[in-house]
């Protein structure tokens, strides 16, 4: 009897099919941590445990502020600013400068959010944090700061109402008046409706466009031209005001040592005081110089023709280097004994 043979048609290498859950999209998150949290590993580990590490990035705020880190553009759906190690946001708020806000805004996707871990970001409208976020291009929606969508264009119809022929109407040289114009926010003209034709002869011309006025700067608005009503500046201060002592600031008060210079727009009286002192010193010096001047009547003649007549020291003719302190010829050049010396207007003539 022949043995029976059974053939197994099932493949031994058939892979086991497993079902995987796929999400339509993954929200990419960026965590910005202050420097103080780097030394508290436990707190940082607890924060990372609440986020999916496959779609979560961690950056330090101080490195971002110093320009050591570059964020990719239009990448993150959520940027979360972590609190400091002590539970506040004092350190992170100091690092959030205008430059850092600009980098964060570029890294956000359209409609992405910028939040803080404690939920207090952008709550104070008068705060510097809120102002810098608005200047960076973020908007507030539902109490959350997010990046708006600037690509969407909205058509704004501009309806130009027609007026009767009796009223003036501005006419364009390019053609008949336009009834409806739709202009998108992006600045590009979408459509122009120019179906209505109006003859130019039926529209009266007006040299002055509507809404344009002219200002006559010479018009005094019917004010009375009375120059007597001008205030005399000499009457602003009374005699009692002039008697009051001047309030000199402490920095302008006289001090020992180097004399202080007056300010350019001095109002405390220091400039006048210094000018008066300088004038007195100049007058005193001029009076002293005036006493030393010799007039034409003050001519003196010294005759040394008499032989054998010498001074007390005998060195008068040798020069100042050999003359005594009381010599009347100090300042005169050396001369020969017996030579006639004349003093004419303080000039020595030999």
Swiss-Prot record:
Pfam families: CIAPIN1, DRE2_N. It is found in: Cytoplasm; Mitochondrion intermembrane space. This is Fe-S cluster assembly protein dre2. A motif (Cx2C motif 1) lies at residues 313-316. It comes from the Eukaryota. Residues 23-156 are annotated as: N-terminal SAM-like domain. Residues 190-208 have a biased composition (Basic and acidic residues). It comes from Sclerotinia sclerotiorum (strain ATCC 18683 / 1980 / Ss-1) (White mold). Residues 252-268 are annotated as: Fe-S binding site A. One of its GO terms (biological process) is iron-sulfur cluster assembly.
């Amino acid at each position: 009897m022949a043995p029976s043979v059974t053939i197994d048609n099932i493949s031994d290498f058939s892979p086991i099919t497993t079902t995987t859950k796929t999400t339509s999209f993954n929200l990419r998150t960026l965590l910005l941590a202050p420097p103080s949290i780097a030394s508290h590993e436990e707190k940082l580990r607890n924060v990372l445990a609440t986020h999916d590490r496959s779609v979560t990035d961690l950056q330090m705020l101080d490195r971002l502020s110093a320009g050591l880190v570059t964020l990719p553009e239009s990448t993150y759906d959520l940027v979360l600013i972590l609190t400091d190690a002590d539970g506040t946001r004092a350190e992170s708020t100091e690092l959030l400068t205008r430059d850092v806000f600009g980098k964060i805004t570029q890294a956000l996707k359209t409609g992405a959010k910028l939040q803080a871990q404690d939920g207090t970001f952008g709550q104070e409208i008068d705060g510097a944090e809120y102002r810098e976020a608005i200047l960076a291009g973020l908007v507030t929606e539902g109490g959350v700061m997010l990046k708006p969508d600037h690509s969407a264009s909205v058509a704004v119809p501009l309806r130009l109402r027609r007026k009767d022929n009796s009223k003036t109407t501005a006419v364009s040289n390019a053609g008949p008046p336009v009834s409806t114009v739709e202009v998108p926010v992006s600045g590009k003209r979408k459509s122009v409706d120019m179906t209505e034709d109006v003859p130019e002869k039926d529209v009266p011309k007006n040299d002055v466009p509507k809404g344009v006025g002219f200002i006559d700067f010479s018009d005094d608005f019917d004010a009375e031209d009375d120059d007597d009503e001008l205030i005399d500046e000499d009457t602003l201060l009374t005699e009692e005001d002039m008697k009051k002592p001047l309030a000199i600031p402490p920095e302008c008060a006289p001090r020992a040592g180097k004399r202080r210079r007056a300010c350019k727009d001095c109002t405390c009286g220091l400039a006048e005081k210094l000018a008066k002192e300088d004038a007195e010193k100049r007058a005193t010096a001029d009076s002293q110089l005036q006493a030393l001047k010799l007039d034409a009547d003050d001519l003196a003649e010294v005759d040394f023709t008499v032989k054998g007549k010498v001074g007390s020291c005998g060195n008068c003719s040798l020069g100042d280097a050999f003359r005594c302190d009381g010599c009347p010829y100090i300042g005169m050049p050396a001369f020969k004994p017996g030579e006639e010396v004349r003093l004419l207007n303080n000039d020595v003539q030999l």
